[in-house]
């Protein structure tokens, strides 16, 4: 794991279960462990690159914040962002973070070959983004996603 952020603290297993129930998803063990140990975090003052290359369009994004559960920090909660964009994102997905490029990191639990972590360019900052396509596959699992991050 090369992600470098200032953690928000620790999520409680009970709150993780409530999140899963609210958005009708089943989070994988590796992501639950991340929430319990760090509960997300911020790249304060953009000290670290935290970059990921989107291979299909040859663009790079930089992680700003990984959201958590009940962080008590403005604009840092999974529930807040997922609820706000619920009608715009895939069913059975949650928004788990954002980037310096103003897009979101989306964890989609589709139950098929398409599930995984995506970059959702809701503001069309990337040249390749359009109304037809503004979500880009990054990784199948949270562990694979973490392995993509460069600093």
Each PLM stretch: what is its role?
Residues 5, 21, 107-108, 128, ...:
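Generic detector of low-complexity/intrinsically disordered segments
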Residues 23, 31-34, 118-120, 142-145:
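Aromatic side chains
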Residues 100-105, 131-132:
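Short, surface-exposed coil-to-beta transition loops
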Residues 113-127:
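Intrinsically disordered, low-complexity regulatory segments enriched in Ser/Thr/Pro
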């Amino acid at each position: 794991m090369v992600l470098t952020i200032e953690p928000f603290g620790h999520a409680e297993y009970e709150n993780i279960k409530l999140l899963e129930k609210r958005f009708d998803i089943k989070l994988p063990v590796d992501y639950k462990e991340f929430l319990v140990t760090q509960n997300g975090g911020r790249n304060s003052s953009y000290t670290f690159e935290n970059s990921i290359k989107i291979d299909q369009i040859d663009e790079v994004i930089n992680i700003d914040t990984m959201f958590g559960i009940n962080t008590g920090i403005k604009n840092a909660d999974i529930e807040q962002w997922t609820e706000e964009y619920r009608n715009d994102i895939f069913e059975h997905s949650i928004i788990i973070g954002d980037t310096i490029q103003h897009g979101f990191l989306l964890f989609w639990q589709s139950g098929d070959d398409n599930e995984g972590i995506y970059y959702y360019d809701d503001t069309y900052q990337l040249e390749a983004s359009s109304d037809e396509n503004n979500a880009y596959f990054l990784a199948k699992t949270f562990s694979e996603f973490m392995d993509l991050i460069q600093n």
